[in-house]
Amino acid sequence: MSQLLTARQAEELHKSMIAYLLSVNLSKSAAALREELADSVHLDDATAKKYEGLLEKKWTSVVRLQKKIMDLESRNAALQQELDSATPTSLSRRNQDPASWLPRAPARHSLQSHRGPVTCVAFHPIFSSLASGSEDTTIKIWDWELGELERTIKGHTRAVLDVDYGGPRGGTLLASCSSDLTIKLWDPSDEYKNIRTLPGHDHSVSAVRFIPSGAAGSPMSGNLLASASRDKTIRIWDVTTGYCVKTIQGHLDWVRDVFPSPDGRFLMSGGDDRVPRLLDASSGETKSTFIGHEHVVECVTIAPAASYPHLAALAGLKKPPPASSSAEFVATGSRDKTIKIWDSRGTLIKTLVGHDNWIRALVFHPGGKYLLSVSDDKTLRCWDLSQECKCVRTVSDAHGHFVSCIRWAPNIINESGLVSGEGGINGQGTPSMNGVSISTTSKKEDTGGGGKIRCVIATGSVDMNVRVFAS
């Protein structure tokens, strides 16, 4: 027996070899191998069926990994050469404070494979995986560093409307929702196997977000998932059981978006009734309503604590709320072409005007100073909260058609195991769903939620492309 394999691994290999020989009609060779192994491998028809594709799958996986290693080595060599020949100007850009980094054209990667409009994107909280969903009913998993398609996930029967990574500590899941009325959970650690389907909504499911585990008083443990639907409800699910644990009513029409606070205590929602709501995630009670939009509210988001100093000044407060407080400020985007920033009581602080079409998605910069928006006017805009929300950068023609979604890559996890990344909330200071320590963080790059800012965003569009903007 090979000294490299355990007894169990050797047995698995032998079963795979025999099953492969049988699958290609080499029964004599299979029988000879059995004889050589002294009949130590017991393989009935059902077991043979299970193992027959395993050898080929592992072989192609090795080839794929070898290619990825070669690509990474090539890229590493190119980056080293670039670093060796760098000018002071290029070095100053490379050493730019991540808290002030903003995306600029051209995109690092334009990812093409979908056959319908891209509706949603989400970053894995640790690995360089990016999920995108489309009206073509598929989810695609990309390596955003290499710009390569890793796999296509099929399972939904109608348009995929949203995706999100998160879940229990140490067990990251991918959630997706669809016009087929279902939510599906996929396991990234098991080749994105569909582990659960959550039926219950009576119409299209527009948005899904994992509710982070965080401060005391928050919903328990990171097992919870929030969904918003055209059936006018928000539902909260326990992903470990698949049960709906709460149905929240109050909206009068289609609920387009739902977004959890970093500590999981609150949910922000918005939709066709034009009145966004701040909800208590535990009780479902409406804490505040936000009245002022003149058309459908397409997107909502909650400001991270890093934004409090800028938004408090904008609101005329003498000092910002404590960083430990939750959902002190929120932002909403609408088909009325405006973005509105509010305090948690429902008081309008600022209306941002500049887009020429529907606002489709929002994300706060993890550093806290900026708010980014994308729109059906094909642009990505960056608003400086410290300058009265002045638009300080416009990426014109960010896509060739309506821009439907934007996400910020999760922060690099620090020693404490916290990540200001996704796990459900667009890289805006979420406690980690995975207690894995990856790197330390300099004070300059710390966002306050823990973790080093990753200067990477992804956008999706009706042009069927996903684009990655990076420093």
UniProtKB/Swiss-Prot annotation:
Residues in LisH domain copies: 9-41
Keyword Cell division attributed: yes
Residue ranges, annotated region (Disordered): 83-108, 424-449
CDD domains with a match to the protein in the record: WD40
InterPro entries hit by this protein: Dynein_regulator_LIS1, G-protein_beta_WD-40_rep, LIS1_N, LisH, PAC1-like_LisH-like_dom, WD40/YVTN_repeat-like_dom_sf, WD40_repeat_CS, WD40_repeat_dom_sf
Extent of the WD repeats: 113-154, 156-196, 200-247, 250-289, 292-352, 354-393, 398-428, 429-467
Record-level Gene Ontology MF annotations: dynein complex binding
Keywords, ordered alphabetically: Cell cycle, Cell division, Coiled coil, Cytoplasm, Cytoskeleton, Microtubule, Mitosis, Repeat, Transport, WD repeat
Repeat among keywords: yes
SUPFAM superfamilies documented for this protein: Lissencephaly-1 protein (Lis-1, PAF-AH alpha) N-terminal domain (SSF109925), WD40 repeat-like (SSF50978)
GO terms for cellular component: cytoplasm; microtubule; microtubule associated complex; spindle pole
Coiled-coil intervals, chain numbering: 60-87
Subcellular localization: Cytoplasm, Cytoskeleton; Cytoplasm, Cytoskeleton, Spindle pole
GO biological process annotation, one example: microtubule sliding
Compositionally biased region (Polar residues): 83-93, 428-441
Summary of subunit composition and partner proteins: Self-associates. Interacts with NDL1 and dynein.
Record comment regarding domains: Dimerization mediated by the LisH domain may be required to activate dynein.
Family stated for the protein in its record: Belongs to the WD repeat LIS1/nudF family.
Role, per record: Positively regulates the activity of the minus-end directed microtubule motor protein dynein. May enhance dynein-mediated microtubule sliding by targeting dynein to the microtubule plus end. Required for nuclear migration during vegetative growth as well as development. Required for retrograde early endosome (EE) transport from the hyphal tip. Required for localization of dynein to the mitotic spindle poles. Recruits additional proteins to the dynein complex at SPBs.
Protein name per the record: Nuclear distribution protein PAC1
Organism this protein belongs to: Coccidioides posadasii (strain C735)
